[in-house]
Amino acid sequence: MRLGESALVVGEVRGGEARALFEAMRIGAAGRVVLGTIHGSGARDTFERVVHDLGVPQSSFKATDVVVSLASLQKTGSLEKTRKVVGITEVGKDWTQTPMEESGFITLGVYAGEVFSVRNLTNSSILKRIAFSKQTNVSELLRHITCGAVFYEMLAQKNIIDMVRFLELKTRFNPIKQEIARSNTKNYAKLAKNELSKILKQYET
């Protein structure tokens, strides 16, 4: 599925399309983002499946920047299952044989004990590349990401799914997000939430 000129998404990768996906990743055919979904329990399992089962060359797997792992989890004493992100792994580029044996996998986030914790973000190569492309630093980029997370979380909580309204809110919130991200305030997430609450109240009245 191509989303305009900025994104290419290939779902349920399990056959010959794997080579096409990784070739698109390697040359950046979609311009900005190339995404694929595949059955695998984590970064290691994904590597094994892509390289050994689907026949993608190991060198081509390096085109992957990040592996996001999801799982269906069941709470103790409950039959209900919820789908959660359980791991975010960056794929380094300085390995020759396998990323598992040469420290090629860098954990950026992991879900354990009902808590999702992040780590190694300031040393992330992919975040440094993104920050460089946006002419900023990793710390400011992380503030942008956090403010963006606040935005999407609050809209999800209020079940705002109308695209017109979503774009209006995003247009109004973006300048505020930019200002907050560039500031040195420590409570930037709380500030973003407060400012977005004000905007949402104006739409509710």
Q: Where do the PLM segments sit?
A:
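Conserved P-loop NTPase
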Residues: 66-156
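Terminal-proximal interaction/regulatory segments of ATP-powered molecular machines
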Residues: 144-205
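Short, Lys/Arg-enriched charge-dense amphipathic segments
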Residues: 32-40, 58-64, 80-103, 184-193
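Intrinsic-disorder/low-complexity, polar/charged segments
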Residues: 17, 42, 137, 162-165
